[in-house]
UniProtKB/Swiss-Prot annotation:
Gene Ontology terms: biological process: defense response to fungus; killing of cells of another organism
Organism listed in the record: Arabidopsis thaliana
Disulphide bonds in the chain: C35-C70, C40-C59, C44-C68, C48-C69
Protein name, entry field: Defensin-like protein 76
The organism's taxonomic lineage, starting at the top: Eukaryota, Viridiplantae, Streptophyta, Embryophyta, Tracheophyta
Compartment annotation: Secreted
UniProt family annotation: Belongs to the DEFL family.
Encoding gene, per UniProt annotation: LCR86
Length: 85
């Protein structure tokens, strides 16, 4: 009886984790872009603008899917790297 209880708890935890992972699968954060699963057409421009990205986009391949990758704004310290002398 105790084993069944532990089995049910483990199953519930697994299901919750799978739902959490599935919710995040539509957007993937890469270093300089945020990618969304969609067709790579002019709709990418609308997707990026609706999420607040104004620096353009490109078609990317990720997790065996193709999608719109919206370019992030770079911070000033990322654009200009200090010289190390």
């Amino acid at each position: 009886m105790q084993n069944q209880k532990h089995s049910h708890i483990l199953t519930a935890i697994t299901i919750v984790l799978l739902f959490a992972m599935a919710a995040k699968i539509n957007a993937i954060d890469v270093h300089d872009a945020m990618c969304y699963r969609s067709e790579c057409t002019s709709v990418c421009d609308q997707i990026c603008l609706s999420h607040g990205y104004t620096n353009g986009w490109y078609c990317g391949t990720f997790r065996l899917h193709t999608g719109c990758c919206c370019l992030k704004k770079k911070e000033l310290n990322q654009i200009i790297s200090p010289s190390k002398n």
